[in-house]
């Protein structure tokens, strides 16, 4: 894999504690699933089992996102064909760490958003952003402090990023007992966004 390793380069065999630890063998031949996948449920389950322990601390989800949608570079080459102008783009991130300025992703919430909007040719209505992260800095927080395998770090930069998308952004607590309500709300938003999406002329 050599030069193809690094943030933003799509799914590789999920590694780390409780990860699937195997190549999910996407039928697309790329690092993403598409409509040609014969068993989407099983393949998604394989790719989504990313584990509970990061092999590369600190986590930098926003830096990975920006690299994945960049118009050029190694990550762009690895993800070729994934970003389509005839479809909406749904970004989902799940982390118990704050993507802070000191040791987290480069840039700012405003810059991360600008990168996403640019990837969709300026059509912010074609984006949905979903985030599960620490809520310790909010009233009625579910998370306690991050200690070993419990709790989370407060995530003001991640919250600012999601909130900047208004009705097209949904936040939830990484420490919630169930993510069911979060994803049920997300599915509704994705459907509404798809229904209202008008693809640009090709």
Model-derived segments and spans:
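Divalent cation-coordinating acidic motifs and surrounding scaffolds
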Residues: 1-202
């Amino acid at each position: 894999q050599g030069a193809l390793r690094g943030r933003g380069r799509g799914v590789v065999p999920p590694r780390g504690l409780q990860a699937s630890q195997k190549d999910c063998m996407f039928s697309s031949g790329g690092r993403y699933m598409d409509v040609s996948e014969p068993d989407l449920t099983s393949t998604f389950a394989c790719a989504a089992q990313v584990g509970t322990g990061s092999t590369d601390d600190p986590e930098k989800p926003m830096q990975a996102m920006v690299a994945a949608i960049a118009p050029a570079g190694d990550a762009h080459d690895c993800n070729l064909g994934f970003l389509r102008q005839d479809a909406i783009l749904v970004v989902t991130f799940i982390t118990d760490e704050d993507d802070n300025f000191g040791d987290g992703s480069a840039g700012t919430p405003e810059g991360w958003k600008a990168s996403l909007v640019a990837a969709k040719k300026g059509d912010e209505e074609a984006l949905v952003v979903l985030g599960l992260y620490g809520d310790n800095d909010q009233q009625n927080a579910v998370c306690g402090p991050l200690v070993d395998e419990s709790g989370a770090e407060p995530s003001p930069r991640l919250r600012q990023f999601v909130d900047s998308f208004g009705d097209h952004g949904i936040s939830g607590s990484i420490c919630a007992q169930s993510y069911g309500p979060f994803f049920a709300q997300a599915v509704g938003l994705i459907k509404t966004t798809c229904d209202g999406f008008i693809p640009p002329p090709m």
